[in-house]
């Protein structure tokens, strides 16, 4: 494809080679716990700040990979695309027309767009989402994009647009399904606790892997499974995939290296001190 090599160089220079801004979202009240988790990982991240709803940080793309893989208490991790002011549609369309969507998405993708607006002149969510999708289509008609394989095209992409006091913040979701979905459960309970909240409760309670954990009304086993993964030092996202695997900047060699390094840290537990039961055999 014409323009493929120059585009790959731009992706490497602007997305892979530079630090990017990220936002790890959390349940209310867990921001500090998420911040502590981030700081405990082997990451060279900068400017980590806990704010309402999550933690902002700067880092390289592979650190986004590792945060998705390892964090127990975050819901999703967003990568910032751009931030700008716009108080009317003319200004919005002008700024959107300059966004380098080809660095973030393959040509075939029409992402889901989620919009929220607060204290802003532009508040019509559907109209704003339409402008976003239109700018992406126009850009793909005029500028070379990389084409995705059939496998990559099956990975949904999701943009988040937040508008506050006429300032737009556009982000792309690196996680895909919410991160509490660990990819290990076969059956769910009627009203299950999210794994992120169970992990937070265990951390706040000071769970010690050397001490017994007794879960006599375990339901779908959320607490016990989280404790088991912690006791063996298995990353929270070990058994699942992520949306960033469908990005043009994704490098499977780096991802596989990170997984191999994480696997070296697994703990072998001869007799796990976790006892779970429930009257419902399912």
Q: What does each model-found stretch correspond to?
A:
Residues 170-204:
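SAM-dependent Rossmann-like transferase core, predominantly class I methyltransferases
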Residues 2-157:
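Non-catalytic nucleic-acid substrate-recognition regions in nucleic-acid-modifying enzymes
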Residues 50, 163-165, 220:
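A generic beta-sheet turn/junction motif
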Residues 16, 152-153, 162, 207, ...:
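Solvent-exposed alpha-helices and their adjacent loops that cap or buttress functional pockets
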Residues 38, 113, 161, 201, ...:
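A residue-level signal for conserved active-site and pocket-lining positions in enzyme catalytic cores
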Residues 193-282:
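Conserved S-adenosyl-L-methionine
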